UniProtKB/Swiss-Prot annotation:
Species of origin: Canis lupus familiaris (Dog)
Family: Belongs to the calreticulin family.
Segments for region (Disordered): 267-311, 526-620
Single GO MF annotation: unfolded protein binding
Membrane topology, Cytoplasmic segments: 502-620
Residues carrying Phosphoserine: S570, S586, S589, S591, S601, S604, S611
Membrane topology classification: Single-pass type I membrane protein
Signal listed as a keyword: yes
Domain of life (superkingdom): Eukaryota
GO cellular component, one term: endoplasmic reticulum membrane
Species lineage: Eukaryota, Metazoa, Chordata, Craniata, Vertebrata
Region annotation (Interaction with PPIB) ranges: 327-360
Gene Ontology terms describing biological process: ERAD pathway; protein folding
The protein, known as: Calmegin
């Protein structure tokens, strides 16, 4: 049978491991994106293994080479901007000082976690307009092949306000990259953008109205994940856009789907306009009654309705208190105040002492007036009750007419073709890093390109990742409430161990009645022994209530078992008493008073005394 202590300890350990497990799960949940679903890659696609600890001793970086058909690639590893054109345009409706696209671009390695031989395009200027573009190897025509656009971004200094998105410039006759500016016609705009605490991942495409020929921007729904860490962790992230001929799209960050949907259903405003619209020439008739309730015209004000009674009146039952001083002011100048020595009446005006409460106004000062109370006769202005309007016609709205510009586009994937890629950006933060652009139609080609470029960067970054302690500290700096989790996680096992090693002492009830084997044998006289034997016999003859004994503490139960030892001990004590009587025959002449004194004493007596074990029986 297990002891109570072992049961308690077992329960403590179960509670400890349960709490520790819950805390561990809550902490780890902060480092995971709960809403992100990992993409199921094709079996033939190459997976990017970025597990820590698998980094080879030396990184032999090689410039990625495209496999398969591509429309555009750029790695910047050559160190030259061959094929790229800097804009010389000016923004419209802007001051001349800031209208010029004079932002500086450089080709550099990463500031942190650099890979030898790998370079990227870096935006170097703050608070300036930047514009640079390059022509594709061949225009992309939306037909029966998917569109895949992929590139890398690293906000090396974080980001306050600025973007890192790209524009796919429409294939128009007047396209001139030297005149590339914010109003240049584009087909798709894609990439991260941030200002203040608004973190965005744009996917915007321009859809042409088939009847009017007017282009309208369509914005994809925002991602369901928190984008903040992609702007703040200063790591290189891979952004991918996939548009399929079946009018679906996917947006990925670091090969993980963060947004997906239909071009027909998941964009704002919708692709297809409504079939009917409100008639702009329709007007509400003058007699149209929109009142749901009206005053009852048949209601009459009661004759006894008095509108002249005020809402409150003076309480006439209150009288002015004795000692009220009508002529005394409530505040008086402070008699102890003195004009400052540096007070200049020409500059500061006439000096006046500060005012204090009048000490004479203990009961009250000034003009006395009785307090105001609610007037029981007050009824206010009479108004007729409201009833349903029999002429109510409802809220008027213009009639619907067929939409003259209605159309139905069942295949919005067929957008305007594009033939150039451009970056047209304004940023308040410099050192934004771009690398490894690719435009293709096969996901396997884009995945292999990512493995050869971005995958190597991730291997290096993971190898340089700080230890778990530094990661926990960094996480706590970003989320201060994690300090409480750390404290509880570290303090809980210490508290449990302390409670096991130094348990709280429980005071025993009836400690005086507990049998102790270490009790010292005390000599007793005949009278004391006789009295004790009588008490023991009376206790043994008394019935024991088992139900009450079960309610006592464990220590008390053990005590009762010892007290319930049968008559064997009582007979031994009787024999001791008889021996005591034989030894005391020579002292029969002792007086009764002396015997009482001997009975009350614990160690004195005329006759020889034999030591016996003293037992006490608790009296109920």
């Amino acid at each position: 049978m297990s002891s109570p202590w072992s049961t308690v300890i077992s329960m403590h350990f179960q509670s400890f491991w349960l709490c520790l497990g819950l805390l561990f799960i809550s902490v780890n949940a902060e480092f995971m994106d709960d809403d992100v679903e990992m993409e199921d890659f094709d079996e033939n696609s190459e997976e990017i293994d970025v597990n820590e600890g698998e980094l080879p001793s030396e990184i032999n970086y090689k410039t990625p080479q495209p496999m398969g058909e591509v429309y555009f690639t750029e790695t910047f590893d050559s160190g030259r901007l061959a094929g790229w054109v800097l804009s010389k345009a000016k923004k419209d409706d802007t001051d001349a000082e800031i209208s010029i696209y004079d932002g500086r671009w450089e080709i550099e390695e990463l500031k942190e976690n650099r890979v030898p031989g790998d370079r990227g395009l870096v935006l170097k200027s703050r608070a300036k307009h930047h514009a640079i573009a390059a022509v594709l190897a061949k225009p992309f025509i939306f037909a029966d092949k998917p569109l895949i656009v992929q590139y890398e971004v690293n906000f090396q200094d974080g980001i306050d306000c600025g973007g890192a998105y790209i524009k796919l410039l429409a294939d128009t006759d007047g396209l001139n990259l030297e005149n590339f500016y914010d109003k240049t016609s584009y087909t798709i705009m894609f990439g991260p953008d941030k200002c203040g605490e608004d973190y965005k991942l744009h996917f915007i495409f321009r859809h042409k109205h088939p009847k009017t020929g007017v282009f309208e921007e369509k914005h994809a729904k925002p991602p369901d994940v928190d984008l903040k860490k992609f702007f703040t962790d200063r790591k290189t992230h891979l952004y991918t856009l996939v548009m399929n001929p079946d009018d679906t799209f996917e947006v990925l960050i670091d090969q993980v789907v963060v947004n997906q949907g239909s071009l027909l259903e998941d964009v704002v405003p919708p692709i297809n306009p409504p079939k009917e619209i409100e008639d702009p020439s329709d007007k509400k008739p003058d007699e149209w009654d929109e009142r749901a309730k009206i005053p009852d015209p048949s209601a009459v004000k009661p004759e006894d309705w008095d509108e002249s009674e005020p809402a409150q009146i003076e309480d006439l039952s209150v009288v002015k208190p004795d000692g009220w001083l009508d002529d005394e002011p409530k505040f008086i100048p402070d008699p102890n105040a003195e004009k400052p020595d540096d007070w200049n009446e020409d500059m500061d005006g006439e000096w006046e002492a500060p005012r204090i409460s009048n000490p004479a106004c203990r009961i009250g000062c000034g003009e006395w007036s009785p307090p105001m109370i609610d007037n029981p006769k007050y009824k206010g202005v009479w108004r007729p009750p409201m009833i349903d309007n029999p002429n109510y016609q409802g809220i008027w709205s213009p009639r619907k007419i067929p939409n003259p510009d209605y159309f139905e586009d069942d295949h919005p994937f067929l957008l305007t073709s594009f033939r150039a890629l451009g970056l047209e950006l304004w940023s308040m933060t410099s050192n934004i890093y771009f690398d490894n652009f690719i435009i293709c139609s096969e996901k396997e080609t884009a995945d292999r390109w990512a493995a050869d470029g971005w995958g190597v960067k991730i291997l290096v970054a993971n190898a340089n990742e700080p230890g778990i302690f530094k990661q926990l500290m960094a996480a706590a700096e970003e989320r201060p409430w994690l300090w409480l989790i750390y404290f509880v996680t570290a303090g809980l096992p210490i508290a449990l161990i302390a409670s096991f090693c130094w348990p709280r002492k429980v005071k025993k009830k009836y400690e005086d009645s507990e049998y102790k084997k270490t009790d010292i044998c005390k000599p007793q006289t005949k009278g004391a022994l006789e009295q004790e034997v009588k008490e023991k016999k009376a206790a043994l003859e008394k019935p024991v209530d088992l139900e009450e004994e079960k309610k006592q503490s464990d220590g008390e139960t053990v005590e009762k078992e010892e007290e319930a030892e049968p008559e064997e001990k009582s007979e031994e004590e009787i024999e001791i008493i008889e021996g005591q009587e034989e030894g005391n025959k020579s002292n029969k002449s002792g007086s009764e008073d002396e015997m009482k004194e001997a009975d009350e004493s614990t160690g004195s007596g005329d006759g020889p005394v034999k030591s016996v074990r003293k037992r006490r029986v608790r009296k109920e």
